[in-house]
Structure formats: C-alpha cells, structure tokens
Amino acid sequence: MESGNVVNAQPELSGIIDGSKSYVYEQLWKLCAGPLCDIPKLGEKVYYFPQGHIELVETSTREELNELQPICDLPSKLQCRVIAIHLKVENNSDETYAEITLMPDTTQVVIPTQNENQFRPLVNSFTKVLTASDTSAHGGFFVPKKHAIECLPSLDMSQPLPAQELLAIDLHGNQWRFNHNYRGTPQRHLLTTGWNAFTTSKKLVAGDVIVFVRGETGELRVGIRRARHQQGNIPSSIVSIDCMRHGVVASAKHAFDNQCMFTVVYKPRSSKFIVSYDKFLDAVNNKFNVGSRFTMRLEGDDFSERRCFGTIIGVSDFSPHWKCSEWRSLEVQWDEFTSFPGPKKVSPWDIEHLMPAINVPRSFLLKNKRLREVNEIGSSSSHLLPPILTQGQENEQLSVASPMNISLRYRDATEDAMNPSKLLMSYPVQPMPKLNYNNQMVTEMEENITTKTGTNFRLFGVTLDTPPVIKDPIEEIGSEISKLTEGKKFGLSQTLRSPTEIQNKQFSSSRTCTKVQMQGVTIGRAVDLSVLNGYDQLILELEKLFDIKGQLQTRNQWEIAFTDSDEDKMLVGDDPWPEFCNMVKKIFIQKRR
C-alpha cells in the first residue's frame, strides 16, 4: 500500500497501461484473467468495499470473515475515483492482478475526456486447455488448424516439411522460441523444440490453459491461466497477513481522512470489491426480496462462462461488525448442485433479476432447502427449479437459459399432491396454455370437447344436442400435475416437457451416433459415444463392429483417427474424453504407417 500523503494538487491520471506496455499486452492480460474479469475504467466513479478487500486474503489469515472486526471506524463502502490502473502478473505463479489507485471522490480530481472511438489495432488470439499429451516430456503442443491459420505466421506449404521458428513474449517480458512445423500422420500443426522447456519452466499440467495473441505488426505474445485447484486466494509476495490486518482498512481510512490516493491489489478471480457507481445504483434499485429469482455468471472448470440460477431466501448483513452493508447481503439457494458450488451469500451487483419477486414465506424456502440438501445426492429430479447449462451445451453456444423453459421437478410428493397450486405459486413455471398454444395442445383441447348425452330435441328431423362443454385448460394442467405427483409416490420421476423440448431431445439423441469408416471396408458403421465411458470402451466397441477383436488394442497394425468440424484429422486419445465427444464428427480406422 502507498503511504498516506496529503495531495494538494490535482492528480495526474496515468492510464490503464504505462508506456512500456502495448495494446497486445493488455489483450493477453485480459484473456489470462478470464471471462469474468471486470476491471473498472480509468476515471470512473466507483464504490470501494473494505469487506471485499479483506476477503481477498481470507486464506492467508485462516479466519472467518465475520470475525474480522474493523480496527477503526470505517464505513462499509467508500465513494472513489479510479486514478490509475496497472495490469501486472505475479512472478512465481503467473497469476494476473491489477494495481488500482483510488482517491476519495472530490472536486480535486479532474477527469480528462476519454476518446471512446480511439483506434484499436486488430488482434488475433486463441486459447486451449492443455491435454496430457501437450504437457508430456516427449510430446509437443498440438495447434488446431483454424487457430494456426488465424493466429500464427503462415508456413511455406510448398516445402516438403513446412517449418518455422516462432518468437513469443510472455507477460513478464521473457522471450520463448518454439519450432512450428506441419507434420505427422495425419499431418497437423505442432510446436516442438522449445515447448518442453516452456512447460517445465511454467510448471504446466493438464487442465491449465495456454493463450496466444498476435497483433497486426506480427507481435506474438504467450500467456497461461492455471486451473482453479492450483490457485490460492492471494500471492504471498504481494500482501502479507499483517498487511491485511492493519494495512487494508487503515490505509483506506487514512486516505479518506487526508483526501489522498491509495492503491489496492485487485485479482480477477476475487470478489468484486470495486464496483461501478452506476452498477451499484442499478442493483440497489432492483430491490431484491425474498423469493426473487436470479441468474449469476460463474466460471466453469473448463474456464468457460456459465449462467446459474437460484432464489433469494434471505436478506441480512454478512458481518455483525459492518451494519447495513450491501456486501454479500443476499442469502441464496442454488437450483442445482454443481462441481463448483456457488457462494451461499452474494452481493446485489453480482446477480441479475429473472422476474419480479414472488411473495413466498421464508419458512417454506428454508424447508425446501433442507429437503434438497438431504436428497440432492443420488436424485436428479428432487426439486422444482431450472437446470443449469451442461458443459457440452456451453461448448456449442454460450447462452442464457430462458425462464420460460424451466422444467417441473417436485420436492415433496405428499405435500404437493394435497395442494398442486402451491407449485405454481412458489416458483416460476411454464405459462398457461393460452399463452403457449401449439399443435399438441390444440389437439388435446379438441379431444376435451365433450357432448352431454342428456335430453335430445328435434327440429325438422335434426337432433339438437346441448352445447359442447370445453374443459378449462388451467384445470387440465392441475390434473397433469396431480398425475405426475401420484406417479412419484410409486418411485416414478417425470418431468413436464413441451413438444419443442421433446423434439429437441430426440434430435440431440439422434446426434449421439458417430459414423466410423475402416480402411478396406466399403460399408461404414456407427457408434453411440453417449453410452461409452472412455477410450477403452470405444476400442472394444470398434473391434466388435468390425470383427477385429484384439487388433486395435495393440495398435501394431491399425490406428484410430477422427475429424472435427473444421475437417482437421487427429489421432484418438490425445484429448480428454468429454472434449473428444464434443468435437468428433467422424472416426477412421486406418493402417498404421
């Protein structure tokens, strides 16, 4: 932290990047920081939350945050201006962080006009999750064909063995040389000589992410993003325990008492304790209440952005020592258990409203929460909540799940059966049929038109019956809910689906079969990857399909390759099984050369 000196003159805004850093460096830093990185703008009015700053060093102190009492009388939030931002990287771990200089928002700070239309050079980049083959001592780094063409310098394909030397610079300014060639069977882009030295120096393992960025001038940059399990809360070389105890709060207090600047360390994966002034006001004006449905952006294990859904079940102070603070003031219940569970308490600016709040008793929400905690392991349909996106769906398209496609899942069959309307009141469900007519519903409506067989009247020999009675579609929905609830009593688990959902499911199911072609065999086969658990089962299944038992396991005579959507041909087994299933389009069994 900077020492607190009184600032009498107007401070100079030094900018987000100093003179020694290029625009390509900035883009590389952002890619290494991740999809959820939210750095404030230079000169922006923000709120600084000391609680969030303290949370950054929670692991270092090994104490619960609600036990950390303020050592001085400091408000829960402080209004500031962003004076300077410097994007940096930790020396030992290559973790990105930003040094942000703040100043109490006063008239002394003059913000220069920012040119929003400033020319930005074109930058090409790609990221890839490293496989075991990429990090092996005797292997190289496989670059997908599309990324090699767009991001790397062009190879001279007229040569028998196209090759070139690449010079890449990391965030520390260190230079790395790689031999880029196009070879192998099948041929593909590889980084060989120099790659092993890079992975060893950076201590890379399978699951880490490699980032390449290339500017218009040919400047090539390389960076890494470590897997979540390798990261700590804060680099020890930046902030110590004593600094957390006395420096974080004391320096902020000193800065506001003396109207001087102070600098904080801001990590992309930490909670947002520097929040845009406008974003904070929007979040507060939303008035999140108990029962409100929300969505929140979270980072998945594959470094992609996920949209998760939940319900607010409480509003209270996160710490008794910081009264009336908006920091993590919302207690939430997540819809589904995931491998990276979301926080139990969130801040209003971290989430987005799905729909207006519903007046739901807190006791009912807590009861359902306890029921889910008991049944969430081993039960896939134990609650009435919208599903999150699966990893495969995210790889194909990052999108927000519409609240109109929320599936019905039931918590307590006995209670719900006694009061089906409770389901419709407690959580958002499908709109009523009058808003969602389709062919299937219209057919059902027509079938529900019945004629009473009471007294018949004749007029000129024609029988006149009583008018037809049309059943209320709302009653029909309630009846369907009762039927499904009764089914669950006998161990059945069902889900209401619209015809569109059923059609989409049938379409996705038909895509699970992958075509397989074997050299020398005219007629191909098809294999269903969704029923297999790994490469070993795939090899056994292929041997059965072509009646070549034992010949594929030894790999002395045959080898297995596949093509992706870009028609790139690669060997089977170099990628994690889920990633392989997502990108494979066709499998080939060919003679080994």
From Swiss-Prot:
Gene Ontology MF annotations: DNA-binding transcription factor activity; transcription cis-regulatory region binding
GO cellular component: nucleus
Keyword Membrane: no
SMART domains: B3
Keyword entries, A-Z: Auxin signaling pathway, DNA-binding, Nucleus, Transcription, Transcription regulation
Subcellular location: Nucleus
Coiled coil recorded as keyword: no
UniProt record, GO biological process: auxin-activated signaling pathway
Stated role: Auxin response factors (ARFs) are transcriptional factors that bind specifically to the DNA sequence 5'-TGTCTC-3' found in the auxin-responsive promoter elements (AuxREs). Could act as transcriptional activator or repressor. Formation of heterodimers with Aux/IAA proteins may alter their ability to modulate early auxin response genes expression.
Domain remark text: Interactions between auxin response factors (ARFs) and Aux/IAA proteins occur through their C-terminal dimerization domains III and IV.
Assembly and oligomerization: Homodimers and heterodimers.
Protein name: Auxin response factor 12
Highest classification ranks of the organism: Eukaryota, Viridiplantae, Streptophyta, Embryophyta, Tracheophyta
Gene name tied to this protein: ARF12
